[in-house]
Curated annotation (Swiss-Prot):
It comes from the Bacteria. This is Putative regulatory protein NT01CX_2250. The lineage of its organism: Bacteria, Bacillati, Bacillota, Clostridia, Eubacteriales. Belongs to the RemA family. InterPro entries: RemA-like (IPR007169).
Length: 90
């Protein structure tokens, strides 16, 4: 099994296998999702104090904020330059 990792900016990396959605933060429903995740303690802020440009939602209900454009994250997801970690069966 292969684990695909995606750079979401500033050296932060997430597992591509866990991503459900990559969305823009401007709409009211997404702002509500961010606030609810913050209240539940499920928000991960990877913006380093910069403007949030992408909101990444994972299958574990974590919400990750990134300063990278959603299109850039999606391009990295489909790119062949991903970092792959192969699990070795022992």
């Amino acid at each position: 099994m292969s684990i695909k990792l995606i750079n979401i900016g500033f050296g932060n990396i997430v597992s591509a296998n866990r991503l459900v959605a990559i969305v823009s933060p401007e709409s009211a429903p997404i702002k509500r999702i961010i606030q609810e995740a913050r209240d539940r303690g499920m928000l991960i802020d990877a913006t380093y104090g910069r403007r949030t440009r992408a909101v990444i939602i994972t299958d574990s209900d974590h919400v990750i904020l990134s300063a990278v454009q959603p299109e850039t994250v999606a391009h990295r997801l489909s790119s062949k330059d991903e970092v792959n970690i192969d699990e070795v069966d022992e």
